[in-house]
Every structure is written in structure tokens, then in C-alpha cells.
Amino acid sequence: MIIKPKVRGFICTTTHPLGCERNVAEQIATTRANIPESERDKGPKNVLVIGASSGYGLAARVTAAFGYGASTLGVFFEKPGTEKKPGTAGWYNAAAFDKFAKAEGLYSKAINGDAFSHEAREKAIELIKQDMGQIDLVVYSLASPVRKLPDSGELKRSALKPIGETYTATAIDTNKDAIVEASVEPATEEEIADTVTVMGGEDWELWVDALDKAGVLAPGARSVAFSYIGTEITWPIYWHGALGKAKEDLDRAAGELDARLGQHGGGANVAVLKSVVTQASAAIPVMPLYISMVYKVMKEQGLHEGTIDQLNRLYRERLYSTQGQNGELATDEAGRLRLDDWELRDDVQQACQDLWPQVTTENLFTLTDYAGYKREFLKLFGFERDDVDYEADVDPVAEFDVVQL
């Protein structure tokens, strides 16, 4: 079929299989350029990525496999394509990853199902025992609006809302490319609690606990989960909002898991990453405008990093750095690995603060990198690539080495 982008709200409802494959190939090429052959043996060897099909989770898997030659098992929840309808971008990303990894002679296997379920954990443990033995890195990168509690089956939903008072700010209506005033009502106590349940550290702990009890964690195994803190511009909706409470719970879990894994010479950390265009960030009010501003400023200063650049740096300069003194990782006072350091530079943030009140619908494309934001957004779904002929017929069915739960 011939597939064109169809955007509804902050989701593109169509995806392009070849475009997604080229995106993954590009991440692999970047990784090879960033991580020298001489450092290949310094990284992880057997890696489990929970939330492995898009965004930072996909980049974590690409970095492990193509930067360090690791065997990888990916867990995600995606929809396969059919003859009549394209699948989700994550499905095609995972299919492309599998194809490229196998061509390289690397072990690659995936589980498609609810990563919050006990069943997913059991299947992962079974595959690790059968194929990998033990794993030395567990990457936790789930971003989901809903979590089905594994014991009761109860559904909990996360809320992207402020706490205490209504938050009103300048934002972009991405459907109309217009600057609007966006207001978000504050979260109720129940919504805050549910957001912590969905996006907090509980499920990360359940995963590490299950892996540990099953004996599939290698001595010295590490685990990392991803977070974002941001700055004053996004704090009301993010760090000081319901989502921030969930991310604080992630910090709590990291402390518990660090103590547990530390008994065998390993450890756990939250990695705080920079803001990038992902399906997750597109859903957060104010983020598209903030990202459009910060991309422009950081590109002008030669500091811009995409998703894969961040993950390459996380592995190379933080998790597996040769600079680490006696195995100590360079963290902030809360034990977090900070990769938002360039974004949080005073000059970068001041430039964004100065830009923010000036942006109007008329100057949106000139004052900010909103054009770049839109392009990156569509690229997530396989569109806007110069090396793909979008008038050509493409097969929406992609089969690969995946266990369907």
C-alpha cells in the first residue's frame, strides 16, 4: 500500500515501515560513529530492555547491541501491521532492529505484550535462562498512560496535570500550528496516586525482584530507569505536577534497588535525560513549544543531541565510562546520572526564558525550531525522510523473531 501521514491530536495514526527501518539504521550508524571499536568490550554483554520499541528504550537497545555487541531481549506492547492497515511505529522499529542485529550475528529476541504483567516477566525469565544465561544490564523505559495491576487486574491511569492550582501557559496547538493559551486543571489526590502507580518505580522493582529471585542477574548487574526533570518552564506540568510525583517514586525505587544490586557489586540509577521529540513528550502540554525553543538554542550553540546521542553518551560517559574512579559512577547528590547537563546550562535556559514571551503564531517558525519539531515528530512514524520514496508501494506486514503474549 501507499502510506501517507495522518495526524490526529498528538498522534500520527499511520506509520511507514521503510521509514521506520531507515530511522533504526540511522541510529545504528550514529552509534558506530560515537562508540569506538576499542571500547566495545567495556560495555554490557546481555541486556534486557523493558519498553524497547521506541524513544529512549529503543536507543538503549541499539546502543547496547551495536555499540557493545550485546545480546538483547526487548519487551514492548505494539500492534503488528496487517494487509489492510499499518502497524505501530514501534512494531516496525523492533522488526528493523531484529533484522539488523541478526545480520550482524547478534542475539536478538522480543516479547510483544503487556510489560506490566507477571506473564511478561515469566516469559522474559524463561528466554533469558534458555538463551542468555544471565543479564548484566536491565533498562527500564516504559511510558504508558495506563497500567493494569498484575495481581488484581485493576486499570490505573496516569494524569498529565499540575498539583494545587490550574496551570495556564503559552502552548502550541500542533494541529493548527498556532500559539494558544493552554489551561490544565489540577490533579485530584486520586489522580496523583494513580499516576505514581502507573509511572512510578513499583513496576521497575517488580521486574528486578523477579529477575533476581529467578537467578538471572549476573554478579555486578546494573539497572537504569529514565526520567526527566526539566526547568521552570515545564516544572508546573512536569516535575511539580502529578508526573513529578511518579518520577520522585522512581528515585525512591532506585535507592532500594541500588542497595539490593549493590550486594553483588552492581547498582541501580535513574538517568535524567534531556527533552527530545518522542511519542511520549508530544502528549505533554507545553513540551512541544519548549522543545521547539530549546532545539533552536542548542542547535545554534552546537549542543543539540537526539535520542540516540543521549543514550550513546549515557553508556559511554556514565554507565561504562573508563574515567570512573574505583567503579563509582558520576552522579548528582540524589544518585542520578545526569544527561540533561547541556540542556540545563544557564545560557541555554536563559535564551529559552527570553524567547518564550516573544513567541506568537506569526513568528513561531522563525523564532523557534518548530519546523524541526514537526519534522522530528513525523519522523518518529517513518515519514519526512529524504531517503524514502513515499509514492512507492510498501508492504505493511513485517514478521520477525517475537513472542506474542
UniProtKB/Swiss-Prot annotation:
Residues of the signal peptide: none
Residues binding substrate: 228
Listed InterPro entries: Eno_Rdtase_FAD-bd_dom, Enoyl-CoA_Rdtase_cat_dom, FabV-like_NADH_b, NAD(P)-bd_dom_sf, Trans-2-enoyl-CoA_reductase
Alphabetical keyword list: Fatty acid biosynthesis, Fatty acid metabolism, Lipid biosynthesis, Lipid metabolism, NAD, Oxidoreductase
UniProt site (Plays an important role in discriminating NADH against NADPH): 78
Binding site for NAD(+): 51-56, 77-78, 114-115, 142-143, 247, 276-278
GO molecular function, one term: trans-2-enoyl-CoA reductase (NADH) activity
Listed GO biological process terms: fatty acid biosynthetic process
HAMAP family: FabV_reductase
Record's function text: Involved in the final reduction of the elongation cycle of fatty acid synthesis (FAS II). Catalyzes the reduction of a carbon-carbon double bond in an enoyl moiety that is covalently linked to an acyl carrier protein (ACP).
Family: Belongs to the TER reductase family.
Subunit: Monomer.
Protein name per its UniProtKB record: Enoyl-[acyl-carrier-protein] reductase [NADH]
